[in-house]
Amino acid sequence: MGARRLGREIALQLLYSRDYTVGEASSLLEMVFDEAEPGTAAGRAFSDELVRGVLEHRETIDATITEKSKNWAISRMAKVDLNILRLAIYELLYRGDIPKNVTINEAIEVAKKFGTEDSPAFINGILDEVASTLPDKG
């Protein structure tokens, strides 16, 4: 598994944990990394950036999800799906170095691993809507 995929998976676990626990992001990050594979420094750095980025821009990210998820209230979305969307939308909006199709494909793969049977299609639909409004990355 690549460092970025691992980073995305760890970031998802951390954001999911934050939905159910009270604590600083850094202490939760340490807890998640204690259970991760050894030798994951690159994944850890990427995961840390993703989590901090999502937390910093959560209001904008959630507004984007609300706008693009027709007939779905954020409060009714599965927490795993919601956090996969938050991570991917952070990448789409704020990481100009990652191609849109890579971000979407990675989110779908993470959804296959952590979500329900319906998660990949749900996430793909919303991310396609978001990506269609963004300029192509150079």
Curated annotation (Swiss-Prot):
Name used for this protein in its record: Transcription antitermination protein NusB
GO biological process assignments: DNA-templated transcription termination; transcription antitermination
GO terms of molecular function: RNA binding
Role of this protein: Involved in transcription antitermination. Required for transcription of ribosomal RNA (rRNA) genes. Binds specifically to the boxA antiterminator sequence of the ribosomal RNA (rrn) operons.
Organism per entry: Geobacter metallireducens (strain ATCC 53774 / DSM 7210 / GS-15)
CDD domains (UniProt xref): Terminator_NusB
Gene3D superfamilies: NusB-like (1.10.940.10)
Any one cellular-component term (Gene Ontology): cytosol
UniProt keywords, alphabetically: RNA-binding, Transcription, Transcription antitermination, Transcription regulation
TM region positions: none
InterPro entries: NusB-like_sf (IPR035926), NusB_fam (IPR011605), NusB_RsmB_TIM44 (IPR006027)
Short name of one Pfam family: NusB
Protein family membership: Belongs to the NusB family.
